[in-house]
Amino acid sequence: VFHQVYDVWGFDLVKLDFLYGAAPFGNASESRAKRMKRAIQFLRDISKDKEILACGVPLMPSFGLVEYSRIGCDVGLDWDDVFYMRLLHRERISTKNAIVNTVNRRQLNGRVFMNDPDVFFIRTENIHLTDKQKDDLARIQALLGGVFLTSDSPANYTDDMIRKYHEYRKLASALVTDVNTDEGITIEYVLDGKTNVIHFDCTNGK
């Protein structure tokens, strides 16, 4: 499979998902963590100098072995999923939780791999996030993440959406100088030589 993807098709990067499936259990001679580390090392060895975006993977076993890694849950098309999913599942799709993961795991970015906080949205179709929720998601990902991707189809963007996309892309080049989470999320950053401070209240995204 990897020969086909790398050598025949010519891809230089693969996204490998659901990697936690390599180590659902340990045994008396090998812990889950050790088994997971061995699996990631195997993927690293066969990928050689090709880049890996790991997803659905325990973070620590992949330190230093992949170029990029998802560092939280999937974002959703709404803010925090439906109520019964919140009652039944600790690990689930949640835009709110994805933002919290992006903030709280920001220190890993550029140290053990580049953080992938999942995608952001600008589109208005097939989405139940408010404009502010979409804007907060994109800005936090741009400032604190290491991978900045959208699942939108840019072909459907209006001129205003294109302008907003370029604004977010520029924000991704900012230098973050301080992050405070005592009351909400406050991020201080420098862009074009100017210091800026923005505040987010991610309790309900309003």
Regions found by a protein language model. Give the residues of each.
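Extracytoplasmic/secreted cell-surface and envelope-processing proteins
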Residues: 22-26, 61-64
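Membrane-embedded transmembrane-helix bundle of lipid-linked glycan/lipid transferases
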Residues: 167-170
